[in-house]
């Protein structure tokens, strides 16, 4: 888990982040990440793990959002996925050892106790509301 920050100059006018806090916790676990933004892209959010967590850009007539995290996946499901992929995660050195992996799970379990699920999944809700009105 890491705290992501929506870029202050764009975050309030972005429909994706409507009613979302500017700083929010999110799972930050990626095998790959965006390094170079498209020429016309706007950086929406970032954190200490990934410089690019959210972008907005246009392609022809389409407005495109890209996010490097998963608001649609519950923390409980994340824990299930970590346990399911435990062997591969350890082999790939995603964690130093099993204690490190278990510590990470504990952090997520603690976050479950304090997080507002509606706010954590706000991007998904906002996106669904937008496409419902197209």
Labelled PLM ranges:
Residues 12-134:
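Amide-donor transfer/coupling interface in amidating biosynthetic enzymes
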Residues 1-11:
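Single conserved hydrophobic/aromatic residue that forms the stacking wall/gate
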């Amino acid at each position: 888990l890491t705290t992501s920050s929506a870029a202050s100059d764009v975050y309030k006018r972005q429909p994706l982040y409507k009613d979302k806090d500017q700083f929010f916790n999110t799972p930050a676990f990626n095998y790959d990440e965006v390094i170079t933004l498209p020429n016309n892209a706007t950086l929406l959010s970032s954190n200490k793990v990934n410089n690019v967590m959210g972008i907005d850009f246009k392609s022809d007539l389409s407005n495109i959002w890209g996010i490097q995290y998963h608001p649609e996946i519950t923390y409980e499901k994340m824990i299930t996925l970590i346990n399911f992929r435990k062997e591969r995660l350890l082999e790939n050195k995603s964690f130093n050892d099993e204690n490190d992996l278990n510590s990470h799970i504990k952090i997520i379990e603690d976050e479950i106790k304090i997080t507002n699920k509606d706010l954590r999944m706000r991007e998904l809700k906002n996106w669904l509301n937008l496409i419902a009105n197209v």
